[in-house]
Curated annotation (Swiss-Prot):
The active site is at C78 (proton donor/acceptor), C189 (proton donor/acceptor). Provides the (R)-glutamate required for cell wall biosynthesis. HAMAP family: Glu_racemase. The lineage of its organism: Bacteria, Pseudomonadati, Pseudomonadota, Gammaproteobacteria, Pasteurellales. One of its GO terms (biological process) is regulation of cell shape. Its EC number is 5.1.1.3. It comes from the Bacteria. The keyword rRNA-binding does not apply. Coiled coil: none annotated. Belongs to the aspartate/glutamate racemases family. It comes from Haemophilus influenzae (strain 86-028NP). Transmembrane segments: none annotated. Pathway: Cell wall biogenesis; peptidoglycan biosynthesis. This is Glutamate racemase.
Length: 269
């Protein structure tokens, strides 16, 4: 590819590395675009934070990165953050802001038993907008909700090279293990597609796993493809975090596997 070709710059933002599940679908669909990824590990997990804190930290990180790399779009690759930060971000930026919404509508269309599980963070499952999605698209279904921080931590450990603790995973999902007609699972946190295979081992009755990542990638393409983008970008893909962490050196060695050249710590407090 000619380096002088205009490439959109897209920032993916999450409190952890769960947003990799969205980024990898975008990279698969649009391999030559310029990607930045920021995970706010100093504020992790967002499911334990107040809404005002999530808004402040997300805005601060996005504005700081935008000053250095003029952005063409921001993807909030975090369901918990997407429930609160989209309006303030859209007020602060004149570029597309793309959120992550649990795939309840497609789940209601594909389920055969009309019994759906929504697996998300504690912050997401209690949001009013989840009630609205269910009322609008899944009134004829039984929708079980399970809010968990443990699965987020398990996914974080997996992406950092650790083995998945299946015993802990099974224990966390045990309340659903006996639901024989639970045939559809909405992965309502971007971390969970990263441990989908392990979840399936624990819930073998589930036939359909609903992950919005591919749809988000198509949305990015729709909003930015063939647009008159003014920046001629020759930058390499870069990752940011907000605090140093124990596995940092090992993590950096694996960056190229995800298509990134470097990891930089930024301060947003």
């Amino acid at each position: 590819m000619d380096k002088k070709e205009k490439r959109p710059t897209v920032l993916f933002f999450d409190s952890g590395v769960g947003g990799f599940s969205v980024y990898r679908e975008a990279k698969k669909l649009l391999p030559n675009w310029h990607y930045l990824y920021c995970f706010d590990n100093a504020g992790f997990p967002y499911s334990e934070r107040e809404e005002e804190s999530i808004i402040h930290r997300t805005l601060a990180a996005c504005q700081l990165i935008n000053q250095r790399y003029p952005l063409d779009a921001i993807v909030i690759a975090c369901n918990t953050a997407s429930t609160v930060v989209l309006p303030p971000l859209r007020a602060a930026f004149e570029i597309p802001i793309i959120g992550t919404v649990p795939a309840i509508k497609p789940a209601s269309e594909i389920t055969k038993t009309k019994h759906i599980g929504l697996l998300a963070t504690k912050g997401t499952v209690k949001r009013h907008y989840i009630d609205e999605l269910i009322d609008k698209f899944a009134q004829d279904c039984i929708v079980e909700r399970l809010g968990t921080t443990k699965l987020v931590e398990i996914a974080e450990q997996k992406i950092r090279g650790h083995s998945v603790d299946l015993i802990s995973l099974k224990d966390e999902l045990s309340s659903w293990a006996g639901m024989a007609d639970l045939d559809t699972l909405v992965l309502g946190c971007t971390h969970f597609p990263l441990i989908k295979d392990e979840i399936q081992l624990c819930l073998p009755q589930v036939k359909y796993f609903m992950d919005p990542s591919a749809a988000i990638a198509k949305r990015i393409k729709y909003l930015l493809d063939d647009k008159n983008l003014q920046v001629q970008n020759e930058k390499y893909n870069q990752m940011f975090c907000t605090a140093h962490f124990p596995e940092e050196s090992q993590f950096k060695k694996a960056l190229h596997l995800w298509g990134f050249e470097s990891l930089e710590v930024i301060k947003i407090d």
